Amino acid sequence: MQTLANLLNTIPAIDPAAMSRAQRHIDGLLKPVGSLGRLEALGVQLAGMPGLNGIPHVGKKAVLVMCADHGVWEEGVAISPKEVTAIQAENMTRGTTGVCVLAAQAGANVHVIDVGIDTAEPIPGLINMRVARGSGNIASAPAMSRRQAEKLLLDVICYTRELAKNGVTLFGVGELGMANTTPAAAIVSTITGRDPEEVVGIGANLPTDKLANKIDVVRRAITLNQPNPQDGVNVLAKVGGFDLVGMAGVMLGAASCGLPVLLDGFLSYAAALAACQMSPAIKPYLIPSHLSAEKGARIALSHLGLEPFLNMDMRLGEGSGAALAMPIIEAACAIYNNMGELAASKIVLPGNTTSDLNS
């Protein structure tokens, strides 16, 4: 039987030789060197991922949406009723939410996973990995036990690996849960060492006159639970939530298969911070989709060393940004595989790294 520690030890390193070969190939394509900017760097990054066998390509695509409620909702940190989590999860099964529409446009499947929705019975059409009916209220207790966090991580890692066996080569992460920007801010504050006031934002349109209470709740949660910033599982268990644990599991699972995973917004940055504490080897597999409009986004991304490809003023969550960015991954693969080569043409660009072919 696989353990979390064993799976973390299976995460392969990026292949530098494959990346060097990819860089030489891209430099020789029918264009000035570097003229396709970050698409070129993305192609090199993908080539280094062992799960893609040295050739950037996209097979099946999947967005995994982790759905859970949060006990900290009781502290008045969100204006949406808690029941919206279950209602929106049901809407996802009908394909009518933002992530579902964007994923369909990108040709990706959406996997809606119940890891902790507060309903008496499981919701039909959802993948049931429910740990409990919502996490603990982090302002007065830990979100969950370490054992619960480790088991959910392992379950999601195994589910992700099974999808990879069935042909998924590009993963996206998403979440759904009222009040979940509060535990996300607690995670970001803990791991980055920044004060809660610097990272707590309005989430889903929280009135600004309620922001001080939200900041205070995050500060109380950290003071009470004393999460260890060096221990990603501890941070998730103390001040996180089941949806955040689930997203971290997708990242770890994809990386263990040597495959890329697209981050979404602020919630996914928080999960990534915790996942990287568990295994720094996953960082090269993380691809940032968009810059979240949430207040602490830049702080989290700076700590991760990541620069998003898109800035659309989005803060919906759900995995919407990950779905929106999937065509960018496909574009990087397309230029790598389909562009002609300078060597096969009569174009010579000696030492030229800046000029346009048409100039």
Curated annotation (Swiss-Prot):
GO terms for biological process: cobalamin biosynthetic process. It is an enzyme of class 2 (transferase). One of its GO terms (molecular function) is nicotinate-nucleotide-dimethylbenzimidazole phosphoribosyltransferase activity. The keyword Transferase applies. Pfam families: DBI_PRT (PF02277). It catalyses: 5,6-dimethylbenzimidazole + nicotinate beta-D-ribonucleotide = alpha-ribazole 5'-phosphate + nicotinate + H(+). Keywords: Cobalamin biosynthesis, Glycosyltransferase, Transferase. The keyword Transferase applies. Gene3D superfamilies: 1.10.1610.10, 3.40.50.10210. InterPro entries: Nict_dMeBzImd_PRibTrfase, Nict_dMeBzImd_PRibTrfase_bact, Nict_dMeBzImd_PRibTrfase_N, Nict_dMeBzImd_PRibTrfase_sf. Its EC number is 2.4.2.21. Pathway: Nucleoside biosynthesis; alpha-ribazole biosynthesis; alpha-ribazole from 5,6-dimethylbenzimidazole: step 1/2. The active site is at E318. It comes from the Bacteria. Coiled coil: none annotated. PANTHER family: NICOTINATE-NUCLEOTIDE--DIMETHYLBENZIMIDAZOLE PHOSPHORIBOSYLTRANSFERASE (PTHR43463:SF1). Homodimer. Belongs to the CobT family. Catalyzes the synthesis of alpha-ribazole-5'-phosphate from nicotinate mononucleotide (NAMN) and 5,6-dimethylbenzimidazole (DMB). This is Nicotinate-nucleotide--dimethylbenzimidazole phosphoribosyltransferase. It comes from Escherichia coli O1:K1 / APEC.
